């Protein structure tokens, strides 16, 4: 991995091939299947996740309070106007978040894995803390697009470049099923981070979250598709611009993602939607 850091610093992302073997991928799939099968729909609001609707999560305490829980977010195309599912629940989910990495033994094992630890040592992280995890389904036919964005819009640290995402392909990710696309080198322009998703701290029944600043626009011709094989991962700088198209294929595009901050000499913004709780302090990625 001698050139991993060089590519990461140049492009703002880097593909690391074949990090997880078939057995490990199968373990994660089986674990998520059990979590979904055990979910009682009556106990969870059918919260629809959308990157297009800026007001969607504004009053959604179910989302806001999910940092130390395993919670379920549905595809727009899977819930009808009466709030009923139009497909089986295992085909209806957009994602599960945001505490899989410490609440589920399988995902904890895969997160605090020597292979992940070595990657972060390679890019120079000294005190990495895992702030969140998500399992993303990108369902066949209804898996929604994720609009162009930078992760630092949603998770802000100071210094601003002390945040990195890890995107693990549970299925092969191709152009057909909605692989990620990036603008190489876009992490060097910090102006994208002026647009932020923040807590309002409102206690009067108003919006709990809001976007501030002007939403940036990007030259769509600069995006490059980055297809990757099952078991490989993409390391994603917090300021690199990326997106994914809708999955209109017959194939699923599952992924497991985590976000990691360099805690050394770094401040976590009190405005971030995701915060530590009494039950959850960002765990050390390098823990034994």
Swiss-Prot record:
The keyword Transit peptide does not apply. Pfam families: PhyH. Keywords: Dioxygenase, Iron, Metal-binding, Oxidoreductase. The keyword Ion transport does not apply. It is an enzyme of class 1 (oxidoreductase). GO terms for molecular function: dioxygenase activity; metal ion binding. Its EC number is 1.-.-.-. Fe cation binds at residues 149, 151, 242. 2-oxoglutarate binds at residues 95, 134, 149-151, 167, 244, 253. InterPro entries: Phytyl_CoA_dOase-like. Its cofactor is Fe cation. Transmembrane segments: none annotated. Has alpha-ketoglutarate-dependent dioxygenase activity. Does not show detectable activity towards fatty acid CoA thioesters. Is not expected to be active with phytanoyl CoA. Belongs to the PhyH family. PHYHD1 subfamily. This is Phytanoyl-CoA dioxygenase domain-containing protein 1 homolog.
């Amino acid at each position: 991995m001698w050139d991993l850091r060089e590519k990461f610093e140049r492009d703002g992302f880097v593909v690391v091939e074949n990090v997880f073997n078939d057995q490990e991928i199968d373990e994660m799939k089986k674990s998520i299947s059990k979590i979904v099968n055990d979910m009682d729909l009556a106990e969870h609001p059918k919260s629809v996740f959308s990157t297009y609707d800026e007001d969607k999560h504004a009053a959604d305490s179910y989302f806001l309070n999910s940092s130390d829980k395993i919670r379920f977010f549905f595809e727009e195309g899977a819930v009808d106007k009466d709030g009923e599912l139009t497909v089986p629940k295992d085909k209806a989910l957009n994602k599960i978040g945001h505490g899989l990495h410490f609440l589920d033994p399988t995902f904890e094992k895969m997160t605090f894995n020597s292979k992940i630890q070595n990657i972060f040592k390679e890019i120079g992280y000294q005190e990495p803390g895992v702030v969140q995890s998500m399992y993303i389904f990108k369902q066949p036919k209804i898996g929604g697009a994720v609009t162009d964005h930078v992760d630092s819009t949603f998770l802000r640290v100071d210094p601003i470049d002390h945040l990195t995402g890890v995107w693990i392909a549970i299925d092969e990710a191709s152009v057909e099923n909605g692989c990620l696309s990036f603008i190489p080198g876009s992490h060097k322009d910090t102006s994208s981070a002026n647009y932020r998703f923040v807590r309002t701290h409102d206690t009067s029944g108003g919006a709990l979250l809001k976007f501030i600043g002007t939403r940036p626009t990007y030259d769509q011709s600069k995006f490059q598709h980055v297809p990757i094989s099952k078991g490989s991962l993409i390391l994603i700088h917090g300021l690199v611009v990326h997106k994914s198209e809708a999955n209109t294929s017959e194939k699923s595009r599952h992924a497991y993602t985590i976000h990691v901050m360099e805690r050394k000499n770094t401040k976590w913004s009190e405005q971030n939607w995701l915060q530590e709780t009494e039950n959850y302090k960002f765990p050390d990625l390098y823990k034994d």
